Amino acid sequence: MAPRDKRLSSTPLEILFFLNGWYYATYFLLELLIFLYKGLLLPYPTANLVLDVVMLLLYLGIEVIRLFFGTKGNLCQRKMPLGISVALTFPSAMMASYYLLLQTYVLRLEAIMNSILLFFCGSELLLEMLTLATFSSMDRI
C-alpha cells in the first residue's frame, strides 16, 4: 500500500472509467434496440440472433466487472483489482471486435459504436499498465 501522504491514483484513468461506464450503458441499450430492429426487419437467423443477444448479456457482465475492479483498484491504489481489470480488458476487446466484424449483419452505427469501445479499451489498458507500474515502483521504495 502507498504511504498516506502519496496519492498514486490516476485521474485520467478514473475519468476514462467514468466515461466508459456511461458510454457502455448507452451502447448496451442501443445494441438491444438494434437487435430488435434486425430481428424484425432483416432475415436474421433466429439461432444467430439468440446467440448474439446472449453474448451481449455476457459482455455486459464482463464490462461491469472490469470497470468495477478497475475503479476500485485505481482509487484504493491496489494492484490486484487493477490487474483483474487488465485481464478482463482482453475479453472485453474481443467481444467488441466480434460485434464489429463477425456478426451476421453489422450496421454502420454498430461499427462506429464498437470502434469507440475499442478505443476506450486500448486507452484504459495503456493507462492501467502505467498505473500498475506506478503502484509497483512505490512498493519498492
Swiss-Prot record:
<feature type="transmembrane region" description="Helical">
    <location>
        <begin position="82"/>
        <end position="102"/>
    </location>
</feature>
<dbReference type="GO" id="GO:0005856">
    <property type="term" value="C:cytoskeleton"/>
</dbReference>
<comment type="function">
    <text>Part of the tectonic-like complex which is required for tissue-specific ciliogenesis and may regulate ciliary membrane composition.</text>
</comment>
<keyword id="KW-0970">Cilium biogenesis/degradation</keyword>
<keyword id="KW-0963">Cytoplasm</keyword>
<protein>
    <recommendedName>
        <fullName>Transmembrane protein 216</fullName>
    </recommendedName>
</protein>
<dbReference type="GO" id="GO:0005737">
    <property type="term" value="C:cytoplasm"/>
</dbReference>
<dbReference type="GO" id="GO:0035869">
    <property type="term" value="C:ciliary transition zone"/>
</dbReference>
<keyword id="KW-0206">Cytoskeleton</keyword>
<feature type="transmembrane region" description="Helical">
    <location>
        <begin position="15"/>
        <end position="35"/>
    </location>
</feature>
<keyword id="KW-1133">Transmembrane helix</keyword>
<dbReference type="GO" id="GO:0036038">
    <property type="term" value="C:MKS complex"/>
</dbReference>
<feature type="transmembrane region" description="Helical">
    <location>
        <begin position="49"/>
        <end position="69"/>
    </location>
</feature>
<keyword id="KW-0966">Cell projection</keyword>
<keyword id="KW-0472">Membrane</keyword>
<dbReference type="Pfam" id="PF09799">
    <property type="entry name" value="Transmemb_17"/>
</dbReference>
<dbReference type="InterPro" id="IPR019184">
    <property type="entry name" value="Uncharacterised_TM-17"/>
</dbReference>
<dbReference type="GO" id="GO:1905515">
    <property type="term" value="P:non-motile cilium assembly"/>
</dbReference>
<dbReference type="GO" id="GO:0060271">
    <property type="term" value="P:cilium assembly"/>
</dbReference>
<dbReference type="GO" id="GO:0005929">
    <property type="term" value="C:cilium"/>
</dbReference>
<feature type="transmembrane region" description="Helical">
    <location>
        <begin position="115"/>
        <end position="135"/>
    </location>
</feature>
<dbReference type="GO" id="GO:0016020">
    <property type="term" value="C:membrane"/>
</dbReference>
<comment type="subunit">
    <text>Part of the tectonic-like complex (also named B9 complex). Interacts with TMEM107.</text>
</comment>
<keyword id="KW-0812">Transmembrane</keyword>
